[in-house]
């Protein structure tokens, strides 16, 4: 087989791998998406719970941004359960790690317990602002939100490293989340799918709450 043949074989394999990954992501996304009955439960039975806190602290840190973005995030994080605790140790409605909550609580004078709904929502929205402010390059508001939520889930440093990967390999400009997420598997491995689905789910829940 000549050089041209090897090149075509390589490109063909790369295409098939890309197709398989896209198909796998679609399956995972469908499997992780709640059923219509679960959606009705989340968006009807829990509509009023903690809404005042989401409104208050969204207004404090994000002005006129729709507060339901953070409620959607909390649905994804904890299903709006104030006593939720993940296997990794994240706690409360906004699933903050102990160190993150402790640092923010010390800065803004919150109670030491992360399971207090008001304090946890306050700290979570405050942490979102830190994640948002990390991204200073000019982008649309929607793109900034996606990067904010991705940073909240995976850490801003990991998202920056993913951006560096796609820029170094000339995948794309690295300005849009749809581009940056292509580099995330090179940074966080199998956990990259969790972050990609996380952003999708927050947007999905927000669309259900509107």
Question: Residues of each region from the PLM?
Answer:
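Short, surface-exposed glycine/acidic/tryptophan-bearing loops
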Residues: 84-104, 167-171
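Non-catalytic cell-wall polysaccharide-engagement segments
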Residues: 2-37, 41-48, 102-103, 107-126, ...
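Peri-catalytic and regulatory segments of divalent metal-dependent proteins
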Residues: 46, 50-61, 69, 84-85
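Short, charged helix-capping/linker segments at alpha-helix termini
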Residues: 58-67, 137, 141
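Extracytoplasmic
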Residues: 49, 65-70, 75, 88-91, ...
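Generic alpha-helical structural context detector
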Residues: 71-75, 95-98, 150, 200, ...
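Acidic/His-rich structured neighborhood in mature extracellular/periplasmic domains
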Residues: 78, 90-91, 98-100, 115, ...
């Amino acid at each position: 087989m000549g050089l041209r043949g090897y090149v075509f074989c390589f490109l063909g394999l790369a295409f098939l791998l890309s197709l398989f990954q896209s198909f796998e992501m679609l399956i995972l996304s469908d499997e992780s998406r709640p059923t219509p009955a679960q959606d009705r439960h989340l968006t009807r039975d829990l509509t009023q719970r903690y809404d005042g806190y989401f409104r208050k602290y969204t207004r404090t840190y994000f002005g006129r941004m729709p507060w339901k973005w953070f409620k959607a995030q909390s649905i994804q994080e904890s299903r709006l359960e104030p006593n939720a605790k993940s296997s990794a140790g994240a706690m409360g409605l906004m699933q903050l790690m102990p160190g993150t909550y402790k640092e923010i609580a010390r800065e803004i004078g919150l109670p030491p317990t992360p399971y207090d709904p008001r304090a946890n929502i306050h700290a979570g929205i405050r942490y979102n602002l830190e994640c948002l402010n990390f991204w200073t390059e000019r982008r649309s508001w929607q793109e900034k939100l996606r990067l904010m939520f991705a940073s909240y889930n995976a850490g801003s440093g990991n998202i920056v490293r993913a951006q560096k990967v796609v820029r170094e390999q000339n995948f794309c400009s690295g300005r849009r989340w749809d581009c940056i997420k292509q580099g995330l598997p090179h940074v966080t491995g199998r956990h990259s799918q969790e972050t990609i689905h996380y952003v999708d789910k927050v947007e999905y829940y927000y669309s259900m709450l509107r």
